[in-house]
Each structure stands twice: as structure tokens, then as C-alpha cells.
């Protein structure tokens, strides 16, 4: 709907003209500080004529979006004060970082965190100088920025972060600015459907503010060129009621924006009151949103060098580029900055004048001081059941079969039960919770769903702890927003398709890396991934579903941020899941299978093994006590572990005098040197496991080069021979998948024979028998369409003799 100047407004927070005049001055102050950050080294209040030496040598920053962000921030302040609201500001166009810094400085929250940036002339000088400057602060709404949970550097995730923040925060309103450039991204386009998962009875609200300034870096935006009627139809289709605020006259725009926000917050209040009156079922509401059309680079130079700037893409970054070298440009900049009348905004000391300071909310109501933007302040410890009570009984290694993720599902079911009252734990997944065998969680909760529910639907409810949507972007974004505001969660996904959020993982890892060096940023719960339906058991879906490379990306990140785990069975998975849910400020990646598989370790043995992260399985090897093996058979991952033990079984029977050591790796980062990762083994401990000179046949779940990379500086790296996924795949049998990649028991046993000095000649007949088995396998699967009985029915025989 259009919100006009003449509309009747009886809301509590209706703004008088005098209030709007003050608000305009506040907005001008924010704009002035934003320009100053981009351009000035000195002379922050223009108390002397602007000279070239006052200008930064490198002009960095983005002006175009910033005046719109400042306009929104100032108006939200008015409504927060009038209605005592709890509002979190998510700045989608994070490149408008000068505006976020300016507003938190004006309200005082910035100087409270950074007392060296005082609220006076010297503080202003430091504020300006530090922006996008060596040793200073970044150009975006980075973790260094008070009030930010969203950097907005890589575009696409603002709205989904906002919804994640609103979940289970019934008193919170998340005002989310969506730039019209960001609105063109895939994740943002999908994010509009998040309102189908927001329950107004238990969750907070999200107020999207679509900022149509019409341009990106050098092109118009799609939404910016659409008509109001098209915009209205589009967003009504998404379930919103658009409120249009359009124009370029500040005086008129202040009135229209004030009215629009009054209507929007009244609508939110009405929706929530209706939902919270005790009714059992709620009809999905039509939530309000603001559509703000304002010029890009609003209030800046209209032209520079005879070329259009305001209202065009030339305003995107630095509209006046050569102020040091070009006196005409310097004059344009000075006129521009003086147009804000800084002498009427700041007092003699350089502080914001009292009547403008009074416009900011107080205490934690200031958006820069909202504790939800520093979620560690609000984080409560997750209540966890005793993982040992879910143990699979394993009387002997390999004696029983189990489904690792099914056991994990029972553990997660009880995590949900124990934290039901706190409402601070959610499971996200792209329609895969049941497929990944975690469906025990549905014994205690449902999938949240605000769309109509049919009588024949299964495990759908308006209140649930499981969120499923066929968008890995939304699952990741909801979880990030949830974690950043102080809660806990778990993301289960097919291994191959977690690549869809590679870049989101990157950005979250960068955020965590920076927060490690900001003492005021309290630790948040870790982001926990379960990657299952993995490469070795996607034989039914084929090559498109077979990719274990996500962990390669994870391993690139800072060692104090990432962990990678390959539990070989259910009990190790339970220990690791419990451990990961207790950690903070990390990203934990767990790769585990869901199919029936041999169970190797009792819970006590699993706990001992996982606590170290790597170890010798003495029960599997044949080496003499106190001696060195002839060969080390190492493994990481459930299927590589199975194939390694099957290979050891073949070798034990065929070559009983061969001394074999079996090493299993659960925590992949133990392979790195101790000085590169806190979990890394010392060289001495590494050599004690892998020897200094004996051949090591390493069966690895993923791409082999990662193991070589992690162990590059180890003594015996030259003796390390890694087999893993070789990018061979199709729709075939489970065992044929490992054969195609030469990770099967026969290839592993053959390589062991070839690598032990002198053994290849002595065991030539054994090697030929193993090769014959590979030919037999190939013929059998192509004739029968399933693996040979000796493969399907193989069990670990226990100790020889």
C-alpha cells in the first residue's frame, strides 16, 4: 500500500513535525560522519578550509547505499524510543559500513566498546582516520562493528540471517535492509519464503526493508526498474504487505517513512497479539514490509565533472575521486560536507548536540548495543543427555551391525527434549532428516510449517524444532542467524550437496576468525555439520551425488576455527556429536555413514579413541609387541575403515608372517604438525604411530591430496601412499564404487604387498589371486547387479588362530 502524507495515523509513535526536523538533523549528522570516514584524515569538523593534506591518500568505501541506511536507522530509532521496542538491525548492503559505524558512534555504543574513539573532536578525527585504513577497521559491517551480526560483504544472506535471529526470540523485531542488488542473488530470492516457517506465537518478527536505490556497481537493478504494481504483486505473492516510501525530498520522505513504520509496527503487534491469545492453530499472517525508493547517493553531489552522480551508479563507491590532486574535486567535497551544516550538529567540543543525542534510544535499546547482536552474552549452556546411554553394545569388534546416524538420531531426540523449555536448539536440513536416519527426533518434535497442513501430512506442525526446506542456503543461513544470536543448532546434509554453501561456510569462518580477536564479542555456539549419505554410499544416485570435497575447503581455514571428524561407527559418532555440541566459536564437520555397517568399538573404547583422535587398533593388527611393523594400514572414514580391515583380513590369511599395524584416524587434524593445529600430533607421537620409514597405506574417505597436504612435513611423508576418491563414480553397487576408485580391500592389499621391500616377489602368487578377485567382481556385478556374497557377507574374523 502507499503511505501518503495525508493518511490518518493514530499510532502511539506518531511523529510531530518538530520531531521530524530533529530527526532530519540526526540523519544529516550520520551522513556527514559517513562521508568523513571515506575521505578525511584530519579537520573532522571543517573548522578550517579543507586542504589536500586533510584527504586520505587512498579513498575507499561505498557512499551510494549509505544515506539510505542512515535514513532507515534514524527512523527506527524514533520508533524504538516511542514504543520501547527491542530491534536488531541487519544491514544487507554491508558495503554501507560507514553508515553502521556512524550510527553506532552517534548513539554512543561505539565509544563504549572502543573508548579511544571518544565523542569529541579528537574522537571524530580517529573515527574518520581508521576507516578502511591500515591498522584501522574494514569497510563493511564487519564483526568489529557494534550491533552487526551480518557483514554483508558477500551478498545474499541478510534476510535469512534475520529470520534465524528472530526464531525463538518472541520479543525481538529484526529490521532487515535488503538492497536491490542483493535481491538479485539466489539465496536472497529464496529467503522470502522464510516467513512460511516463522510462528508469531513463539518467534519474533522480521521487517524486511527493500531498499530500491536503482543501481548496482555499474548497472540498474532488476527490482529497481520494476513498477510499483509489479513489486506489490511479487511481494504479496511472497506473503507480505508492501508499504511504499518513495521520493527524494527529505522533508516529505521523513513524514512518509514515519507513517510507514508506524503502520508496520502496529501490524506486527496485531499479528503477534492475535497469535498469542491461546488459539491452537494460527493462519499464516501477511507480514508488513517497507519498499523504500530513494536515490542512490542521496544528498551527495548531483554531478561531478558534468556527469550524473546522485541517483545513478556513479554514486556507488567514491563519487568524488581525485580530491588530493584536483582542486575542483576538493571544492565539490567541501561543499558537499558543509551542506550538512556540521556547526549545527556538533558542539564546541565536537560532541553531538544534546537535542540530537536525545533522539537515540537508551541502554540496550540502542541497536548497536542490542545483546542479540552479541549472542554470546545471551547464550545458555545446552543441556545434553549422557551419550553413553545410547551406546551400541559391541561384544567384539565387528560382531554387530548398526546404523550410526540412527543412533545419533536418538541422542538428538533427547537433546531436543532436554532443551524444550529453553527453546534454544534447532535442527536444520534440506528435506533430509528422515533420509539421513535421524527420524527418531520426530518422537519428540515435528517439522515447523506455517503453510496449510493436510490430514495425511506426516510430522508437520506450526511448532517444531526441525526446519526443513529444499535450500541448503536457507538451512545454513537460518542456523547462522540462530547461533549468532546466542542459540545452538545442528545441520544435517548430503555430503555432495553441502558444496552449495561452500561460500557461506567461508564467510562464517571469516566472521569467527575476526571475533577471536575482539574480547567484547562473546563466544557463540559452534556451527555443527553432519555430512552423511556420503560419496561411498551414493551408489544408487550416481556421480552427481558423489563428492567428498567439502572438507578440503574446511581445512583451508584457520586451525583454531575448524575441526573435521570421521567416526568409523556409531559409538564414535555419539562421542563426537556430544563433544561438538559442547564447543563454541568453531565449525565442526562430522562425516558419517547412515547405512548398516559393522560396529568396531565399545563405548569405552570409542571414548578413549576419540579423546586422542587417532590410534593403533591393536586388535586388528599382527605386529609383534615392542617391534615395528612391516606395513602400516591407516584409515579415516567408515567405508575406508571397513575396506582396510577387510584388506588386513586378506593379508593375515595369505601372509601370516607379515607384521601389520592398523591406525585409525577420527580427528583428521591430528595429522597436522602440532605447531599448525592445536589437535596436531607432535612429530615424535606421529612417528610412533606411522613409523619413520615403513610403508603406510592410507585409505581415506575423500580426495587423497588432503592427506598429503596435512602430512607434508612429517618424517615419513615419502612413505605415505594414500588412496581415496579419484573422481570415479556412477550408479552401481556399493563395493563397485570403491573398486572404481581403487580404495577396495583388494587394491589396498595389493599395494601393501608392493610397498613392503622384497614382498612383491615372494607374494607374487597372492597378488595375482587378489587381481583375479577384482576380475571376478567385475564380471559378477555386471551379471547379477549386486556385490558378490563374500563381499556382502564379510565379517571381521577376530584374532587369527
Curated annotation (Swiss-Prot):
Listed EC numbers: 4.1.2.-
Gene3D superfamilies named in the record: 3.40.50.920, 3.40.50.970
GO molecular function, one term: aldehyde-lyase activity
PROSITE patterns tied to this protein: PHOSPHOKETOLASE_1, PHOSPHOKETOLASE_2
Biological processes annotated in GO: carbohydrate metabolic process
Highest rank taxon of the organism: Bacteria
Cofactor needs: thiamine diphosphate
InterPro entries: Phosphoketolase, THDP-binding, Transketo_C/PFOR_II, Xul5P/Fru6P_PKetolase, Xul5P/Fru6P_PKetolase_C, Xul5P/Fru6P_PKetolase_CS, Xul5P/Fru6P_PKetolase_N, Xul5P/Fru6P_PKetolase_ThDP_BS
Disulfide bonds: none
Keyword terms of this UniProt record: Lyase, Thiamine pyrophosphate
Family recorded in the similarity comment: Belongs to the XFP family.
UniProt-recorded name of the protein: Probable phosphoketolase
Species per Swiss-Prot/TrEMBL record: Bradyrhizobium diazoefficiens (strain JCM 10833 / BCRC 13528 / IAM 13628 / NBRC 14792 / USDA 110)
